[in-house]
C-alpha cells in the first residue's frame, strides 16, 4: 500500500522537453574536520535546446546527483538566445576570461564542430553545426565555459 502512494507522487522536476544537457565538470572538494575529511561536490552543466538557446549552471551539494540537478535548474533559468546562420555563427569573434582566450570562427557546411571538450559542449547545446575554435592560455573547462558563452552571446 505504501508503494502505491509513492508511485502516485508528483515528480518535482518537469520533463525537460528535448533539452540538450552536457555535464562539463564534476569537482570533489574536501573539508578537513576533526573526524577526517568531509567531501562535497560541485558540478558545471551546459543546457540548450539545439535551436539557438543556451545557458550554464553551477551547483554544489554533498552528493554528485543533487549538485548536477542544481546546476541543471540554474542552466535552464539562465538560457539566452544565440544568433545562428546556416548552422554557424555569423562572423569571427574572440573572447577573454582570466588567462583563457578563445577564438570562434564560422565554418562551411560539413565541417562539424572542431573544438575542445568544454567549448564543444556549449556549441552542441546551442545547436551550432559548423564551427572552428581555438583555445589558448588555460586547461580549465570551467574557465572555458565561462568564456565561451559570453563570447557567443556577443555575436
What kind of feature is each model-predicted range?
Residues 2-147:
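Ribosome-associated RNA-binding proteins
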Residues 146-155:
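Single conserved hydrophobic/aromatic residue that forms the stacking wall/gate
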Amino acid at each position: 500500500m505504501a508503494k502505491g502512494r509513492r508511485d502516485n507522487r508528483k515528480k518535482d522536476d518537469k520533463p525537460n522537453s528535448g533539452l540538450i544537457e552536457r555535464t562539463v565538470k564534476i569537482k570533489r572538494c574536501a573539508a578537513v574536520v576533526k573526524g577526517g575529511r568531509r567531501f562535497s561536490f560541485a558540478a558545471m552543466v551546459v543546457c540548450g535546446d539545439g535551436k539557438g538557446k543556451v545557458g550554464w549552471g553551477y551547483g554544489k551539494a554533498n552528493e554528485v546527483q543533487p549538485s548536477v540537478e542544481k546546476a541543471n535548474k540554474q542552466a535552464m533559468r539562465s538560457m539566452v538566445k544565440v544568433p545562428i546562420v546556416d548552422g554557424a555563427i555569423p562572423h569571427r569573434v574572440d573572447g577573454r576570461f582570466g588567462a583563457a582566450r578563445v577564438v570562434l570562427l564560422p565554418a562551411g557546411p560539413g565541417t562539424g564542430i572542431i573544438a575542445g571538450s568544454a567549448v564543444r559542449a556549449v556549441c552542441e547545446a546551442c545547436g551550432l553545426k559548423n564551427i572552428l575554435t581555438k583555445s589558448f592560455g588555460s586547461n580549465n573547462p570551467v574557465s572555458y565555459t565561462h568564456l565561451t558563452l559570453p563570447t557567443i552571446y556577443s555575436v
